């Protein structure tokens, strides 16, 4: 699966200051004491790297940004088919995406909402608003409890919606505009 390749996810870091001749080009060992916190070294997505050899810290770009991708459309189609209990057509839609990524094909028996959500994150990591997807599929609370040890005991149904800013509520003078449940 090319989506997990070393090119697409940067896992290794190298010293790139040519003035530091003893370190230049050497792989950073994240257990070393360095000038930065080792907590800041983690796998990074290269799909948003815009640096150039002459300016590796380039943060801005005129590169076009994607709003919609064909793979996202196929994954939404698979979600719709799952909603109709048509796992074969859902698997066919997912396999369009997996084929492009060089991943193995799946069969209808493996097609579940959890598998589809995992496929979405493999394909759309860094692009989609994951929270909205998990709320839409009614999986936010289950996924947080399973994977987020920090807040797994704190998340509730209230957290599916965000509070409406008081200024918005106050600006609706001609109608009653209630706050979302749990935020009163």
Residue ranges with predicted function:
Residues 1, 5-6, 65-99, 113-123:
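Extended, hydrophobic/aromatic-rich amphipathic alpha-helical segments that build helical scaffolds
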Residues 60-61, 87, 93, 105-107:
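A generic helix-loop boundary/linker signal
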Residues 102:
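Short arginine-rich
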Residues 1-69:
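Flexible, polar/acidic helix-loop-strand segments at domain edges
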Residues 14, 20, 31, 42-43, ...:
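Residue-level detector of solvent-exposed, low-hydrophobicity positions
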Residues 57, 64-67, 98, 106-184:
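Long, intrinsically disordered, low-complexity segments
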